Amino acid sequence: MLATDSDPIVAIATAAGRGGIGVVRVSFGRGGEAAALPLIDALCGQKLAPRHASYVPFLDAHGAPLDRGIALYFPAPHSYTGEHVLELQGHGGPIVMQLLLQRCLDAGRGFGLRLAEPGEFTRRAFLNDKLDLAQAEAVADLIEASTEAAARSAGRSLDGAFSRQIHALVDDVITLRMLVEATLDFPEEEIDFLEAADARGKLAKIRAQLAHVLGDARQGALLREGLSVVLAGQPNVGKSSLLNALAGAELAIVTPIAGTTRDKVAQTIQVEGIPLHIIDTAGLRETEDEVERIGIARTWSEIERADVVLHLLDSRTGMTADDETIAARFPAGVPVVRVLNKTDLTGVPACVEHPAAEGDLTEVHLSAKRGDGIDMLRAELLRIAGWQAGAEGVYLARERHLIALRAAQEHLAQAANHAEQRAQSLDLFAEELRLAQEQLNAITGEFTSDDLLGVIFSRFCIGK
């Protein structure tokens, strides 16, 4: 534990700016009650009943009111951080909040009260076993949620839904490890612990449950991160019109002049709660215009980073030689949807096709101008993302969670291989189970480095 993890800390816990209510939060750390009671007396001029709202004046150093509001005192361990906590709820003007914050710092100087760092209150909650690491991350995810579905999923993670799944997996792995260790420790016994307890069957069940958890986590990661979708193609094929159609607003300038879009135009839209980060880019062509060439270079950079590329074509011409050249440069591994736009000029009905000669490629015929086929394109993007309609019960997950789950999955797969060669590989079987358990524990913080904690909590807002 870092030395600063026990310092008394204070911060404004509400967003910057003006509001009806502002909150200053103090967590007393090692100071405990000996620090809390004198500060309460100095600020409020009276004792506070624990866990009761008291309407009091907030006093300056001379005993004059700075403000009046609600004071709440939570003795340890029954508080957000698990420490003695004081919350002062006053009027939410920035000057009033700064005066109240400075008054706390001045009154608490004797016991080392300092400004909190970003995420430090939630870090204290984690260190004091009020939250595990997945729940602590869910606090930030709930604050940052950009869709209702993401907010609900973050709430489920904060309530411990994700953590309970991980703890159940860890318990099952530990039980299986005990069987393996027993067989290793008593090789001369007639009892075959692995056979008697159906160790292989237990491992198969753990792997199936892990696959289910990983599937839900992928859905949650989609809700949190969304999908980066790049519109690419030659000039004047309707990329900007498609962006406007997907967004339902006139975001990009649309003209019949080739090269109108010279830099990217980005917009995030929601489809079934999934954030789709749509990026309109400069038309891809050979040009002598230096500004346009810079825009085209940026287009290729965006394509390299994309989750999905929408390759737009003019449905009147179909796939031209120039389009073939563009398609050949698309990075391997990035899904591409071929979008044939302007069907309003050809009379071709909006549809989704899977050309037999094109492998996994999908073609969507649509009219961005009229809106025909836009819903089909949205559905195709969700399909590529792997979103399952009605997956409301998922919990929000982060990339580090997915990495740990995949690593645990690989260790369990290796354990299954060793189980088939029991006589030669029992030690390796046990080791793979241990490594899988370690990966799962890292998700909830049972086994986590201080460096990782620093990165996670530094991304929180101050006062949380």
Curated annotation (Swiss-Prot):
Co-factor binding details: Binds 1 potassium ion per subunit.
EC number: 3.6.-.-
GO molecular function (one): GTP binding
PROSITE patterns, per database record: G_TRME (PS51709)
The protein's required cofactors: K(+)
Binding residue positions for (6S)-5-formyl-5,6,7,8-tetrahydrofolate: 25, 87, 130, 464
Domain TrmE-type G intervals: 226-386
Localization, UniProt: Cytoplasm
Binding sites annotated in the UniProt record for Mg(2+): 240, 261
Signal peptide as annotated in the record: none
Residues annotated for GTP binding in this entry: 236-241, 255-261, 280-283
Subunit (UniProt): Homodimer. Heterotetramer of two MnmE and two MnmG subunits.
Name of the protein this chain belongs to: tRNA modification GTPase MnmE
